[in-house]
Amino acid sequence: MKTRCFDHIDLRVTNMEAAGKFYGKILPQLGFVHESPGDDYYTFYAGGGERPLEFFCLSEDKNHRPNGTRIAFWADTREEVDQISKLVRDAGGKNLEGPEVCEDYSPGYYAFFFEDPDGNKLEICCREKPVFAD
């Protein structure tokens, strides 16, 4: 049986220093507990111990152009979504929508949609009832 379905996210940014500062204020609140900066990358790790590591990596690409891809991070409660949405705005993220209830997604879906300083689209969400496969 698989222990997880993805290993990491590698997001392109145009300014590593600015992106490291921005994500350094947000990702620790989402469970990423270790930072590993490098010259052309910046990695935030979650997991460890009995859990395999998962990581969110920033890679600098001066020619990067954002697209319609959106990455959604899980929050345990609506209050956590609200708290992180404030951190995002204070860190310079662009508020696109919310925080708000998105019933058309699924019952009890609550989310905040935003762009990072490079224009990459992200989301913080929680669900009253998580989705399970049949």
List the predicted regions and their residue ranges.
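Short glycine-/small-residue motifs
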Residues: E123-I124
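Core segments of cupin and vicinal oxygen chelate
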Residues: D10-E54
